[in-house]
């Protein structure tokens, strides 16, 4: 569910929020496929208009006293003509296509048992990339991956969740946010539509009834 939770990044990831890479006060949206199984969420860095919540440091992931020793990490070029600088596309059930600034990647996971999953990351470039562009893609690969400046927090929080659920194997809980609809929203990413779309697909192929 991590990659389908389109609003968690701005709340959890200090790097995204502090250095204004991907935030909810940028233009963006989320588009679901017709069957709702697949989705893409996106944001446009150039449209940032800092919201009061961020300026007043009410978002805990905003650490504005932080700075980079190598700020050139964020000196991205515009790779496409749609202004999109961050996107996550999921292909049901376990394939993800990712764009973060100029870092292009494919990731997928392989279950290794009931309590173990292996996650693979494949970083991409173009044959037409200049040496400078190739160097930038390699540098920005440090944002994600197993020990990425952004992704390391995902590994941490997922471990917390796994430990918590192991402690109560016979219990269940559910928190409903924003209704039950799974539909596209091209004005906001503060939605659980993609998560619902995934479970809609899961129910369908497993033969479960809603």
Regions found by a protein language model. Name each.
Residues 1-210:
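C-terminal catalytic domain of Rieske-type non-heme iron oxygenases
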